[in-house]
Amino acid sequence: MTEIRSFYDEVGGRPTFEKLVAEFYRGVAGDPVLKPMYPEEDLGPAALRLQLFLEQYWGGPGTYSEERGHPRLRLRHQPFTVNPDARDRWLAHMRTAVDSLELPPLAEETLWDYLQRAAFAMVNTFDD
């Protein structure tokens, strides 16, 4: 019988998602539009939340839901102005992070497709 492996396992598990999130937040830390959206001075708590969410989404441990409940992504982002500029900046930093992983083409495409759809879904205003 063949063991079915999750996307999380296929791309390398926790180390892959740690690297993705670390690379992403390196960009966010210097971004004048995105950085103010994070309430903590240190981006560490936000990075951990994103890492746990992505790990769970892709078939890894369920720690995110155990600690925070249902993801409710749109609701959690509602207090912030997520306009097309913020979305595009988020995607630019995430593109750099995804590229740093050097995943096989199908895995890269699968991950990137999800991230793009998620970013577009978070837009909650077209105002500045």
Please tell me what each predicted stretch does.
Residues 2-5, 18-99, 105, 112, ...:
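Heme-based O2/NO sensor domains and their adjacent alpha-helical segments
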